[in-house]
């Protein structure tokens, strides 16, 4: 029994060391899955012999141990095969070789280059799903491991093999619309590309969340292999200055659903657009008709009006920044590191800071592509409280922290 406890301890310690190492070498990840295999094999054998506690570790049910051991064996053997190909010299993170990613659609292949595709159903921002698509898929075939390119369009998520068989769809948004949509309408946003699609009903035009109108293409969205034509801004369609405030009014703020679509004033050029059967989601803070009347009555439409910024009041609710200035700590690392760190801080050191944000990323130039590491922002009531936090809360290896003080200009 002592030998089994020692072997279990070594296997678990090996896993922890490899996780903290954050290696990009495939051989290190093979060692990790070998250790997982050893751990669950020992636990399975112990459970079969009636042992419920091995060392300081409770032994799970034998079915759980068996399933985890099978997963580890499959991952170990697959990675060993992959390491013998030209892809073995590429950088691989532990996340790239995780079981969850390996089993995500399309299943049983390794994936890299994750990005998020947003699908909005019924033109309702609250009825939105997010799908992960990977740029590179490493797939096992009869001829060995091959690289496939993946992407998204108005029809669904697809990949293209080197054999040149065209786009192979493994998830279709039309099927998703049948589950989540009531009207059959859906729209797709992939980075800086926008697609429109219809699964069951038809509509001439749909309102886009970024202030553009996209015409529906067909019963299954865009045809395979064909990109949607670029959408035209509303201002170019109407040809009237009255449409200027539409984008400014929409912005990216959505306070709740509206019960009616946009109504353009007579003479503004809006007659070329037919009202969508799907209500537009979002709140326009200015009335377009009244704004048009004001502009028509104005003696000089080129005269600029002074911009009045909204002032903070005591009834606004929660505010991260205080009028007298706030002390901050900006903490960055991998998404999992930051998430675990925030959990430990909230659980054990809640009295040492004031507020903590959720995990966030900086957005790159192309759509919703992430750049840099995951980050959280922690606020403090005073520099002394921040100093106490830094003194008593350790920062795990691989994470970075920066301190700064910010004050409100308006």
UniProtKB/Swiss-Prot annotation:
Changing residue 340 to A: 90% decrease in DNA-binding affinity. Residues 198-239, 263-282, 289-314 are annotated as: Disordered. Residues 325-410 are annotated as: DNA-binding domain. InterPro entries: E2/EBNA1_C_sf, Nucleotide-bd_a/b_plait_sf, Papillomavirus_E2_C, PPV_E2_N, Reg_prot_E2, Regulatory_protein_E2_N, Regulatory_protein_E2_N_1, Regulatory_protein_E2_N_2. GO terms for biological process: DNA replication; DNA-templated transcription; regulation of DNA replication; viral DNA genome replication. One of its GO terms (molecular function) is DNA-binding transcription factor activity. Its main location: host cell. The keyword Lyase does not apply. Binds DNA as homodimer. Interacts with protein E1; this interaction greatly increases E1 DNA-binding activity. Interacts with protein L1; this interaction enhances E2-dependent replication and transcription activation. Interacts with protein L2; this interaction inhibits E2 transcriptional activity but not DNA replication function E2. Interacts with protein E7; this interaction inhibits E7 oncogenic activity. Interacts with host TAF1; this interaction modulates E2-dependent transcriptional regulation. Interacts with host BRD4; this interaction mediates E2 transcriptional activation function. This is Regulatory protein E2. The gene is E2.
């Amino acid at each position: 029994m002592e030998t089994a406890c020692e072997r279990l301890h070594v296997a678990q310690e090996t896993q922890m060391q490899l996780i903290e190492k954050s290696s990009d070498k495939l051989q290190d990840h093979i060692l990790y899955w070998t250790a997982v295999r050893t751990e669950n094999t020992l636990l399975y054998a112990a459970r079969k012999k009636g042992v419920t506690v091995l060392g300081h570790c409770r032994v799970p049910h034998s079915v759980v141990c068996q399933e985890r051991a099978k997963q580890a064996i499959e991952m170990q053997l697959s990675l060993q095969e992959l390491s013998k190909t030209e892809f073995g010299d590429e950088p691989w993170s532990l996340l790239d070789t995780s079981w969850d990613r390996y089993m995500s659609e399309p299943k049983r292949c390794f994936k890299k280059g994750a990005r998020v595709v947003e699908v909005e159903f019924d033109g309702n921002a609250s009825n939105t799903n997010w799908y992960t698509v990977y740029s590179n898929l490493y797939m096992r075939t009869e001829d060995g491991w091959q690289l496939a390119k993946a992407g998204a369009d108005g029809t669904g998520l697809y990949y293209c093999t080197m054999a040149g068989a065209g786009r192979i769809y493994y998830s279709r948004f039309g099927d998703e619309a049948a589950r989540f949509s009531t009207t059959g309408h859906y729209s797709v946003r992939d980075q800086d590309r926008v697609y429109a699609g219809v699964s069951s009903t038809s509509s001439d035009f749909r309102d886009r969340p970024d202030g553009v109108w996209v015409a529906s293409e067909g019963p299954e969205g865009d045809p395979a292999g064909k990109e949607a034509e670029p959408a035209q801004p509303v201002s170019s369609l109407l040809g009237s200055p009255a449409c200027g405030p539409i984008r400014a009014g929409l912005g990216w703020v959505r306070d709740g659903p509206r019960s009616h679509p946009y109504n353009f004033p007579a003479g503004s050029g809006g007659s070329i657009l037919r009202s969508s059967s799907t209500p537009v989601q979002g709140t326009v803070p200015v009335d377009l008709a009244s704004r048009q009347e004001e502009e028509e009555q104005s003696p000089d439409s080129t005269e600029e009006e002074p911009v009045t910024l909204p002032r903070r009041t005591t009834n606004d609710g929660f505010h991260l920044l205080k009028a007298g200035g706030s002390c901050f700590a900006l903490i960055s690392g991998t998404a999992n590191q930051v998430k675990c760190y925030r959990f430990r801080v909230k659980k054990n050191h809640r009295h040492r800071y004031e507020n903590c944000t959720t995990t966030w990323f900086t957005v790159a130039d192309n759509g919703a592509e992430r750049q840099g590491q995951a980050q959280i922002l922690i606020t403090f009531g005073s520099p002394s409280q921040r100093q106490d936090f830094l003194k008593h809360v350790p920062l795990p290896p691989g994470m970075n922290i920066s301190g700064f003080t910010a004050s409100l200009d308006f």
